[in-house]
Amino acid sequence: MQAAIMYGPNDIRVEDIEKPKCPPNGLILKVLSIGLCGSDIRNMTTDSCKGKYPHIFGHEIVGMVDEIDINTPKYKVGDKLYIYPEDHCLKCDECRTGHSENCLNPGDYIARQGGFADFVVVTNEQINRDAVFKLPENVNLDNATLSEPLSSVYACQENINITLGDSVVIIGAGPIGCFHAQMAKIRGAKCVIMVEINDKRLEMAK
């Protein structure tokens, strides 16, 4: 398979490598679509891995089950899945009350090889942590890669309870800022103000 492998800051090489083996009680996902997050750009242009190279980034992953362990009955070959990128347990009190950033049992997702490749491993731990979601057939796969950033926007607006008739000021008209603007309108905000120093981004937001 091919993968975009990071060997150091700004040193990304597309190479042919061996396809990973299916893990016990896990599966192999054929990557169908993947987002390019701002954190990916930051990570690939800095020493984010602290010298632990080579590494494959990419965490906004949608794919199709290519191989699956016989002991993983929840999914089947051909299923289209979205992989939640973080490694929160989603079971502790912090996670269940909407504060997964304070997870009491976090894993080390940054050490896992990512989705800038033809295939990616999905472990039994990820499945048990409810980090794998089956997609309905009618969902656009490119749009589905944005599930995690959009869920972050939703959680933010839930926390501050944006509702009908509110006025909302959003600082920054990048992708997340635009998500916030759209979400605020959906929630009934009467006035959405965006503050941005980049004219191109502001025009895009309009």
PLM feature spans:
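Surface-exposed amphipathic alpha-helices with a cationic face
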Residues: 158, 181-186
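Glycine-rich beta-strand-centered segment in the early N-terminal region that forms part
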Residues: 20-34, 47-96, 136
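Adenosine-nucleotide cofactor-binding segment
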Residues: 170, 185-206
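Nucleotide donor/acceptor-binding cores
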Residues: 1, 165-166, 190
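N-terminal Rossmann-fold NAD(P) dinucleotide-binding loop
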Residues: 177-178
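NAD(P)H dinucleotide-binding glycine-rich loop of Rossmann-like/cofactor-binding domains
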Residues: 91-171
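Short N-terminal strand-loop motif that marks the start
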Residues: 1-61, 120-122, 126-129
